[in-house]
């Protein structure tokens, strides 16, 4: 029996659309120091304030996009897991969520108990960020350390510029981009600017000029989420043969009053509508599975906002989800994952 297991990890979801389940999920998510990178007392106070109203608001949003089978993110991730079982021939393929269930700890313990001493951990995030990639890796390391697991852990690296990922993205999006449209907006998840500046290895590059991300050195690019997003967008546009002016980049899901990376998706939708754009396509390449940020934030609220600003039609291009070419690409990428523990 082969013993090289694969553990796919996505963000997670509330167990249901009930306010109690959403509150529990948001508390776990927002109390992660890699998500809100403030000292514990400040973070606890801030999250407590957020949890006064946000759970009810978010529960309503989740209910508007919830499927009969459950959370779209979890359902689509499980479908990808099934696709991966045919692509990953070295051992079992399990699925974990960083927040909620099934947890990273539960799955690591399950795999080790079954005799698998080599596991590839696959954070399903194309671009690197502490709040996504790092927190998954650190949680896995915590489990290995605290449970004293005898296991070799390899970790899938960010794949924002890898040909396999880009080719799958192009193949998935092409049918949608063959229709008539005025503009393509590539909307990535946003982050507070401080999440980027604190990782700048030079200490004097991030946000020092408008083209800092375009001119990032290899050392800066390795940990700069915004630069990686722009690189993904540019490589995608190049592969699709999109002319300048036909596409642009924005960042969504801003939370709180801190300065986040720009341009903001909400502002960009208004600008495009008021500039005469009538039909817009929106892709969300930071997500490999459709979720509340794509289906509700863009597909529902973004569509309404665009129309109110003067646009006529917003079409959300689906994420990679369980696309067979994406599953094949992911298996290839995981084959190259370097040893971490």
Curated annotation (Swiss-Prot):
Coiled coil: none
GO cellular component: cytoplasm
Primary location: cytoplasm
CDD domains: Ferrochelatase_C, Ferrochelatase_N
PANTHER family registered for this protein in UniProt: FERROCHELATASE, FERROCHELATASE, MITOCHONDRIAL
Entry similarity comment: Belongs to the ferrochelatase family.
Record-given protein name: Ferrochelatase
Source species of the chain: Pseudomonas fluorescens (strain Pf0-1)
UniProt gene name: hemH
